[in-house]
Design a protein with these regions (language model features):
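Short, acidic Ser/Thr/Gly-rich low-complexity loop/linker segments typical of extracellular
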Residues: 40-57
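N-terminal active-site segment of His-dependent metallophosphoesterases
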Residues: 22, 71-165
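A short, amphipathic beta-strand motif
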Residues: 23-30, 52, 95, 275
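Extended active-site neighborhood of metal-dependent phosphoesterases/phosphodiesterases
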Residues: 71-76, 162-254
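Short, ordered, surface-exposed loop/turn motifs in non-cytosolic proteins
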Residues: 21-23, 29-43
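Single conserved hydrophobic/aromatic residue that forms the stacking wall/gate
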Residues: 274-283
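A short, solvent-exposed beta-strand micro-motif common in secreted/extracellular proteins
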Residues: 61-75
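Short acidic, glycine-rich surface-loop motifs adjacent to enzyme active sites
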Residues: 252-270
Length: 283
């Protein structure tokens, strides 16, 4: 084989390796397929058919395949957080959801931010004060047949990421679903690459950006920390997320009530903090 043929063969192998991976599966609840559920890999999107089946060409760099949990449903929880995602390690991934409230019905949403326990005393206060209070409020709503969930808006820990298993155990004791958001202190400070620095967070909590529905409302969770390593970061949204949001908004009705959840403030007084375009400009 001459050098030219070797070169073309190498290009062909590179092209084949860069091809998207076809992923198939079903989204189910109560033994039946759920139609028109949005499925994504963090780049591309698909809608489930009438029998709940989907097919999506997953990006080769995708970490997960996951669903936009529809109104009236909830994914099973592990350590208190909904597992609406599957690690991309097979060609087929099914999802089992369960009923949670009613489609378009009432619900209660609570929010907490910057729990970031640094030492034993901080963990003790979370475990004996803050988390029990959150549980009590959630149970008060549920006693009125109003489903409840909470959103933790980042800095779940304070750089001590070896404590992720412990804090997940404590989150589970709240006994209501907790949707997580990644903060700057939830990144691995030893890693300077933004995507790679979230590896431990993804292991315990799943995607760093995603969406779900509750009642008549639409929620988008974003990672607006551009991590540089060694506790250094900028506030902004990378192009991958902005493109994902732009594509996702085609599934959100115009005029819908939309919540965007992220760790760092989007505005400080009259100053726009983003180093990247505003998500408002994606539609």
């Amino acid at each position: 084989m001459n050098k030219k043929n070797i070169f073309y063969a190498a290009l062909l192998l590179m092209a084949i390796g860069a091809e998207a991976k076809e992923i198939k599966g079903k989204v189910m609840a109560d033994g039946k397929g759920l139609a028109k559920v949005v499925v994504t890999d963090g780049t591309a999107f698909a809608l489930t058919s009438e029998d709940g089946s989907y097919m999506i060409d997953a990006d080769e760099k995708a970490h997960f395949i996951y669903v936009v949990t529809p109104s009236g449903y909830m994914a099973p929880c592990n350590g208190g957080t909904p597992v609406f995602y599957k690690t991309l390690n097979e060609n087929s991934h099914d999802f089992q959801l369960h009923r949670w409230g009613t489609v378009g019905g009432k619900y209660a949403m609570m929010a907490a931010a910057d729990t970031q326990p640094r030492g034993e005393n901080a963990f003790h206060r979370l475990e004996t004060e803050a988390f029990p209070d959150l549980k009590q409020v959630g149970f008060e709503y549920m006693s009125q047949n109003i489903p409840a969930f909470a959103i933790f808006l980042g800095d779940i820990l304070w750089d001590n990421l070896e404590m992720f298993p412990h804090i997940k155990q404590e989150i589970a004791k709240i006994q209501i679903p907790i949707y997580p958001v990644i903060g700057n202190h939830d990144h691995d400070k030893e890693v300077s690459d933004d995507d790679a620095s979230a590896h431990l967070y993804r292991h315990f909590f799943g995607p760093t950006y995603y969406a779900f529905n509750a009642g008549k409302d639409y929620y988008i969770v974003l990672d607006n920390i551009l991590y540089k390593g060694n506790k250094k970061y900028e506030v902004g949204l990378n192009d991958q997320q902005l493109n994902w949001v732009k594509s996702y908004l085609q599934y959100v009705p115009k005029g819908a009530h939309l919540f965007v959840c992220m760790h760092a403030p989007a505005y400080f007084y009259n100053c726009l903090l983003y180093t990247s375009p505003s998500p408002r400009d994606t539609r």
